[in-house]
Amino acid sequence: MLCIRPEALVLLGALLTVPLDPVGGQDALSLTWEVQRYDGWFNNLRQHEHGAAGSPLRRLVPANYADGVYQALGEPLLPNPRQLSHTTMRGPAGLRSIRNRTVLGVFFGYHVLSDLVSIEKPGCPAEFLNIHIPPGDPVFDPHKSGDVVLPFQRSRWDPNTGQSPSNPRDLTNEVTGWLDGSAIYGSSHSWSDELRSFSGGQLASGPDPAFPRQAQDPLFMWTPPDPATGQRGPQGLYAFGAEQGNREPFLQALGLLWFRYHNLCAQKLAREHPLWGDEELFQHARKRVIATYQSITMYEWLPSFLQQTPPNYTEYRPFLDPSISPEFLAASEQFFSTMVPPGVYMRNASCHFQMVLNESYGSFPALRVCNSYWIRENPNLNSAEAVNQLLLGMASQISELEDWIVVEDLRDYWPGPGKFSRTDYVASSIQRGRDMGLPSYTQALQALGLNTPKNWSDFNPNVDPQVLEATAALYNQDLSRLELFSGGLLESYGDPGPLFSTIVLDQFVRLRDGDRYWFENTKNGLFSKEEIAEIRSTTLRDVLVAVTNVSSSALQPNVFIWNEDSPCPQPQQLTTEDLPHCVPLTVIQYFEGSGPGFGITIVALCCLPLMSLLISGVVAYFRSRERKKLQKRGKESVKKEADKDGVSAMEWPGPKERSYPVSIQLLPDRHLQVLDRHLSVLRTIQLRPRHRVNLILSNNLGRRTLLLKIPKEYDLVLLFNSEDERGAFVQHLQGFCASCALGLDIDEMGESELFRKAVTKQQRGRILEIFFRHLFAQVLDIDQADAGALPLDSSQKVREALTCELSRAEFAESLGLKPQDMFVESMFSLADKDGNGYLSFREFLDVLVVFMKGSPEDKSRLMFTMYDLDGNGFLSKDEFFTMIRSFIEISNNCLSKAQLTEVVESMFREAGFQDKQELTWEDFHFMLRDHDSELRHTQLCVKGGGGGVGVIFKPDISSRVSFIIRTPEERSSPQGVRLPASEASELGGPVLKKRFGKKAVVPPPRLYTEALQEKKQRGFLAQKLQQYKRFVENYRRHIVCVAIFSAICAGLFVERAYYYAFVSPPSGIAETTFVGIILSRGTAASVSFMFSYILLTMCRNLITFLRETFLNHYVPFDAAVDFHRWIAMAALVLAILHSVGHVVNVYIFSVSPLSLLACVFPSVFVNDGSKLPQKFYWWFFQTIPGMTGVLLLVVLAIMYVFASPYFRRRSFRGFWLTHHFYILLYVLLIIHGSFALIQLPRFHIFFLVPALIYVGDKLVSLSRKKVEISVVKAELLPSGVTHLQFQRPQGFEYKSGQWVRIACLGLGTNEYHPFTLTSAPHEDTLSLHIRAVGPWTTRLREIYSHPMGDGYARYPKLYLDGPFGEGHQEWHKFEVSVLVGGGIGVTPFASILKDLVFKSSLGSQMLCKKIYFIWVTRTQRQFEWLADIIREVEENDHRDLVSVHIYITQLAEKFDLRTTMLYICERHFQKVLNRSLFTGLRSITHFGRPPFEPFFNSLQEVHPQVRKIGVFSCGPPGMTKNVEKTCQLINRQDQTHFVHHYENF
């Protein structure tokens, strides 16, 4: 073991204590002694830490804790502290000290205690021994509520103690345990430096040199509020070496005394030694002041206090432990409390006792103690002379009697803790004793070898028997329970009792003899014997005389004792009656006044998403307006041209409907046309010669309204901008009527009456509904009650309308066709027998009867008559050609004249009429001989026709077209639509491979029907179980990954929550805000993990690479974007919970006292006694975590709202820009946690690895996407589709179905948009088909509409990033795959189909044996470019791998006469050219929406050996949801398993 000689330790102590920056050589030579440290270290060379600041108290008697370790004793074993104080220590003031001890001696004792010990600092984590106030307490519970609790926080303890009964808790002494002037100079070098002026060796003074400067940071003086006035802050408090040196003016006066004495000594030394520098002067003055302080305390004050002379000093005893004991603290402090008077006199040197001013109550003979605690800028002590008068007054005033009574100024009006302005000093002292684990009174006597009383009667006979009896009753007559504090006071009378005297004397002797720096120790080199004798002869009177400049005769020789011959006797012993009343208790409500602001702040934070939504709405509005401007740009010239011949106005459609702009055109053929703002014809009104035009004008409200009455139709109501515009139109109309020989009647009425008189379209619609209801009631023999009764109304306009004749437009609308269609014109002309341009009820009924009840011959004759345009009884080839052309109009198709001629010739040739130029009705009916059943079921489908009209149409098995029609039963059935026979035949057995023109060798099988009949019906629970099993099977990889990720997040949450709830380092935060800290810290860990690893879901290059590895069998990399959204939403929920947790925290922290917050946040708060916590807005807006948290909520609100699907569809650029806020998000997240308010930063633990991977992935993309790529070809296709063909970069490898991100240099280099490649991997160039649906794609179409140069320079270049993978790449992993594309969502399948056929032509081995491609489009012309690709696939598909079904949804979904004829023509066209009349393809063409459930059901029967079928859909959300729902429905059955992948556009 290494041994160190004492001399070496002395040298080490000298090196550590002597300043290293002397002013000069003379200075260095002048400090010939070892300078004493400020923190108490090395005062004892054997035990360096003895007496050091922060060292524990050392017990004289073993601890007395309830558990033997740290838990304090309390009720019911010991009495209530307040009850004990009120019962035992209560008594009248004004009892004079028996020994004539002065008040100066009492407060000098308090000053000595502040130099020796300080345990007022609360411990951490906060522990409370609250004092419960008995109900009805006159001071603290005058209203008898019974729920008043005075908070008492336990003191700071040594963390190395309190572990076991052999090592019980010991409190920590915050100051040095030596009598070394720490109350004057501070207990640390830094504290002393703050007190010094560093000039002339003096302590720093304020504007008045007699006063030190005021307390300020970083000098943490104790600054509680004034309990009398509530004044707060350091203003008016002085900087002393003792933290609580400003507690009372009396203690403050003693601090000022020693401050001035030090500066006096420094000034004297400076005069004597002019060459000394500041450090020498300061250290010499400090040395002399400390020695004088030690001498006065030990040899003048202590004997007067104990009435005992301490033993003579012999030598320094290094083996003696001088540490302060808790018993000494209790004995001395509590004995002083009995001597404190209710007031303190002030006098001058001539013995004149001053009247003191009380701002509230006037003048009084003395300062009231209870109203002087922590007083700021006392008007009675605003000068050095006033302080001198207070010191002289204390020297002349005799203290209270040394007994058990404590004045009410301490007992009831001591400065209170927390939100209480007052507390009970005695009760708090009792609790402090229990906190320190003080022994009982009898245990202390026994331990110190003193006589122990046997019973209660053995106490001091001077004790009031009633007090003794009451005390015994509180302790249940058990003397062994009597506490040290109570017993010590009860045994004292006039002088401290044996116990207190023994404890105090022992402590001071140990302090003296164990201190190496004691002034009488001649071996330390501090003083010579002459100097020691001089110091011993210096008394406090000498100090007072030197400082106050009063005559020595104005003070008695011993200022701690007043004798009869002493000068300036006090006027009288002060009582409470002579003084102002104590300011009563007040309770501070920390949150008072903060409620509205706190609520508004929370509401504002909750409204952040709404504010973001409002901003997004404004952005979407402007983007929509911009898009409309782009769309209108091409129509402006047309509109201007139309405005030349038309009149602009607003049409009023009816009440509670918005008016809309229209343009009125008057045509020479007596027609009035109403056009919308897109110049589309809304309505055509035919004005007949024998009709008079009725015009009604408004004569009020601006005279700008006009009503045009139209017989047998709804009226036209126009609103003009002004009367002049209306007048111009009326003149124009008058001229038009005159030129067309039309009569015009003009009338005027009020505008409101005009509106009531008008027959609106809505009213006309109700009349037509009744018209059709009764029409079908007569045709189909429906009961009148079922048809509905005609409404009876006396209104003239309704009676006129009930004559009800249909116009050509209404007739066309009822058939779902256009008025200008040839079919409409032919049918209308045929039915309009009287030729008046309208169909009456009877005329329509005659035609309807033929369709509803007529034979096939009647129907064909009707068709023949309709198209016999010249009425000669023959149908020429030209008329037949016209008929076919009218059929084609239904699909908006435009076949060439040659194609139509070929169709007509083929039909004539098929019927054997190739040599005829005209057909009779018999010939025409013969041509339809194969379609007798179709004609039999043909009806005229009318809107509003009621039930029973539509009948399923079942064409021949070799048909390439089908109609999807719903019967009423099907409309109400859950399965929706039946499978047409064309589909059943297409999917059935060997017929599946038949081409048109070839006859089937077997009858068409009814696979779909038979399969339904054979299916086993399961119960509801069984179906749900099967559906669940299929869901798990489909998404097992997704479920496992989500479960693992969720488990990690949950684990992080639980770990942090458990840590802070139970095993965190003792800071007290869990006890302060248990729910808030668990919620906030648990969610913080999970959110940190989520926001870190969400970056991996956006590492597109890494995902594309990994999906080609074996990991793709376990991780669904194609669901990265969905997983990204899921993480984002989960993180959002947890972020909200995190915010809620912090809202709880902020509220709790805003109502928690500063002492508690200083424990929870030691790096932020310092407990200076000011009590008040920070307001809520400080936490929100003035801290780094709070401010960054609010900013994070703002960023999240913007990012999430702008990332919503709704907004992305309206402004992709807004989404693109706001999503780049993620950089700001991560910066704020890092800053948010870096403040380490509760824990050390942990975000980097989660963030570092994903961030590095993400940055690497972005660098890979950056290296690619900054290469300019030339566009080879640009085509503008119908339906707003732009086809771009561009160079394929070198080394660019991709797979069919993948997508890329492009930026157009002409539109900005930073805005990238994702599009699916429509080129195949084997092609030399890349191609995209981009539909103009937003501003960016619309501008892209504009840019590429006009070439700018020659060659590759003709078009703006592109930046390319990708390729990236999607789930559609897995089509080849299934034996049977179904591809469903809707709208622009067909783009991935264009690449897949081309790739499939290419691989098939090369004879590549593929698992996939059959692909069904379902294309859903409004019209076959919508995406003609895809038709070309399908045509190419059909030409190269020699192995019949692909079966294409095209669903045209815009066709009339009615089985009427014209669609029947259309089907017949389609069939003949297929026979001739083996391709569709509409698309030119061999694909199956359907009119209607795809019936997914029957289609998938039939696939199970067609491919019974296949157990798993892949379904890949891409398109609008509605379509993909239907596919997903169908797959889930079929997966309930224990048959083929349908695995669905989808992507929404």
Swiss-Prot record:
Residue intervals annotated with topology Cytoplasmic: 623-1037, 1098-1125, 1204-1220, 1264-1545
Domain EF-hand: 819-854, 855-890, 899-934
Induction context: By forskolin and down-regulated by iodide (at protein level). By insulin.
Spans within the Extracellular topological domain: 26-601, 1059-1074, 1149-1182, 1242
Residues given in the record as Ca(2+) 1 binding sites: 832, 834, 836, 838, 843
Membrane topology classification: Multi-pass membrane protein
Sequence ranges assigned to domain Ferric oxidoreductase in this UniProt record: 1081-1263
UniProt record similarity statement: In the N-terminal section; belongs to the peroxidase family.
Protein name as it appears in the record: Dual oxidase 2
Species this chain originates from: Sus scrofa (Pig)
Lineage: Eukaryota, Metazoa, Chordata, Craniata, Vertebrata
Primary gene name: DUOX2
